Every structure is written in C-alpha cells, then in structure tokens.
Amino acid sequence: MLERISFISKLRQLQLIIKAVLALSLLFSFAVFGILTSSSPVYADEEKPAMRIQISPVENRVTLNENEVNEYTFNVDNTGSEGYSFKVYANPYSVVNEQYSPSFSNQNAHTQVSRWITFKNDTGEYSQEATYSVEAGQRKEVTYKITVPSDIPGGGQYAIVFVEAIPKDDNSGGIRTVSRLGLRVFGRTNGETKESAEILSHNMDSFYMSGKIKTNGTVKNSGNADFNAIFKFKVEKIFGGVVYEDSKGYDVLPDTTRNIELTWDETPAFGIYRITSTLNALDQSRSTTKIVLIIPVFMIVILLMLLTITIAWFIILFRKRQAQKSKLII
C-alpha cells in the first residue's frame, strides 16, 4: 500500500513538473510574440534634403532598325529643397556574375547601343553628354535620340542613361557625394535573333527554424537576346486555402547565367504549409510542390524538454514495476 502511495506521489510530482514546463513555455512564447509584433515608434517626417533626384520612366525597351533615328524623352524631377544642375550620359550595361552585379564599363557586342545615344541640350544640339538645370519642385524633360548604323549585330542591345547631379560646392580636399540615377535602355535589333533558355536548377527547402521561406533557381541564356524568366510562388494551408501567392519576372541577358530568388516576406514564425514553386523561361518550365515546416528554435527546445521528461517518466515507471516483480518473486 505504501509503495502504491509513493508511486502516485511521484507521478503527481512529474505531472506538476510537466505543467510548470508548459507554463514557462507559454510565457516565453507570448514574450517572443510580443517582441516580434511590437509596433515600431513613429517619427516625424524628415526634412527634405537639399539635393534629391527622381526620374521617370526608369526603363525604355526599343526596337532598333538599321539606319533609323528615333527620339525619346524622360523626366527628371527635383524633389529636394534646392535647385541644382545635372548632366546626362550613356554607358554600357552588362552583368559580371550569376548574382547579376551590374557593370557600366564592360563593353561587348551587346552594348554598342551606348555609343548610338546622344542628348539634346538647351541650344537644340545633340552630344554624347549634356548639362541642364532644374529648380526645387520642378521637372525637366530630357530628349535623347538613338542613331542606328547600317551594320548592326542581331539580338539585344543594352545601355544605361545616367542622370548625375552636379554639386554646387566642389571641395577637392573633402569627401564628395554624388547623386546618380539610371534609366536602362533595352533594344532589340531587326537582325537575326536567337532565343535559348535552360533551367539549370530549381530548389526549395522543406524545413525552417527561422527566416523567410524562399525558392531559388538558376537560368542560363545561350541566345543573343534577353528574355524574362517568371517565378511563381503559391502557399496553401495543409487542409486547403491559399495563404500567399506571388509572381515575379527576372531579365536574363544573352550569354549569361542568372541566380534568381523569390521570397515570402511575411513568413510566420510557426506553421506547416503546402508550397508550390514554378519557374518558367521561354519554352522551359519546372515545378515542385513540398510540405514546408516552420518551427522556431525555442519550440524545438521545449519539445526536447517534454520528450526528455516523458522518457524519464517511462524509465521511472519501468523500474518501479521491475522492483515490484522482484519483491513478488522473493
């Protein structure tokens, strides 16, 4: 009888320990949730900087035919508090790695258009570089033309038009900050065009302890013209219902390989979802669907603690029964 009372007492103690662990776990979870969801302080609007540039549009896709001359325009807005002068000029546009770090100096067969661009100055003349002025809160329209020669390569042509503010005080002995924005010019010539895409990889993890859920892939362009690789991302609950859906396009330039990534920015701290990721590039397509688990580290620690307590309880129970059997044999 005493042994039974002792066993029941130990069992109750173990139950109290489990309840205490669960209570502490809940308190810790609420504390973490409160930290993650606490609203950021609101600050008053910052004072306008003296010099600030805004351009529109930021990209121009054009058709380039032999011996043609075409004019285009873009706007430069002074959103700062003071007037300033700025200059415009064109540079080659290319990339130097699979992460698509841009290069504005490397020249190749697909950057010749940067030499075909000239700008109309205030006197009506065209030149490789032009300077203008714009007052605070005002807009300046810039006109440029592309003069296409008779002998042009087939496929795509890429350049960037820079708008660079000219500081009023040029202190050569100090640090000079330059404000510069760019407008991408993507051209397609009327020569022979070859389009070729290859999806080299398409991956998505199934388990996350922190961070944002993402899917990534690698696309190769073996042609002579750019194309748009489309990433699609669909997140569903296990028992149905779409939680999140997104689609994004990525330019892939000729003779390059690009690593691309799509991220679920509002990934929750905990959950289990069915996620479908699809990558399309010209006539190539890959799709994968996975069950993805998101579980933070502190919850893993709690589960391990509960598992340890459960195992300890079974060990105590097993030893108790073994001891009882031994006494009965004696």
Set out the residue ranges of the language-model regions.
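N-terminal edge beta-strand
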Residues: 47-71, 200, 204-209
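Surface-exposed binding patches on compact interaction domains or structured appendages
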Residues: 50-57, 82-144, 230-231, 237-240
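Short, solvent-exposed loop/turn segments enriched in Ser/Thr/Gly
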Residues: 56, 67-73, 140-142, 154-160, ...
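Beta-strand-rich interaction surfaces with strong enrichment in secreted/lumenal proteins
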Residues: 60-63, 128-134, 148, 247-252, ...
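Short Pro-Gly-centered flexible turn/kink motifs
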Residues: 67-72, 132-145, 253-263
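Terminal connector regions
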Residues: 82-113, 141, 147-192, 266-300
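Membrane-proximal extracellular "stem/stalk" segments
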Residues: 191-301
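Cytoplasmic C-terminal tails of single-pass
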Residues: 322-330
